[in-house]
């Protein structure tokens, strides 16, 4: 069964998928006929640096996109699909689009908790959503999305389902569907 630890309203917590035995409100998750025992994803934290601020004393808008990439790479590392390992297999994952909505300002020295989650995945493309909150107050700072595809080194689209089923399985396990 799937569920969240914490207050149930935010994703400030570990995302946990458990095998039978604990009653939770979310749907059962099966991955290619096998239940997932337990998956824990830590949120990514970023400590805002002075050089990331603009003339108004707040974090420049371009930095949020960089933070999203840092959080996505951390997520990939946690699920066992580091970019370095994928590139060694000659799989690249360029950004197709990115969007960011600013809800409240981040200042120098703030710590932002970034919770990325894979919301769409079909073996050829994926979409990641990001939620950034203040570590101390929990206030929502920013939300965003990025979409990506999978290409070989020649720049041709590849299907992970067909070419790399073990990688496809890992992506499927961590996709919120």
Which sequence ranges carry the predicted segments?
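Short, Lys/Arg-enriched N-terminal segments with co-localized hydrophobic residues
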Residues: 11-23
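Hydrophobic residues in beta-strands and at strand termini
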Residues: 46-50, 102, 150
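Hydrophobic beta-strand-centered segment that forms part of the acyl-chain substrate-binding groove
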Residues: 75-126
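Anionic, Ser/Thr-rich low-complexity intrinsically disordered regions
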Residues: 60-61, 69, 99, 103, ...
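Catalytic strand-loop segment that frames the active site of acyl-thioester-processing enzymes
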Residues: 25-78
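HotDog/MaoC-like acyl-thioester-processing domains
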Residues: 25-44, 107-108, 119-177
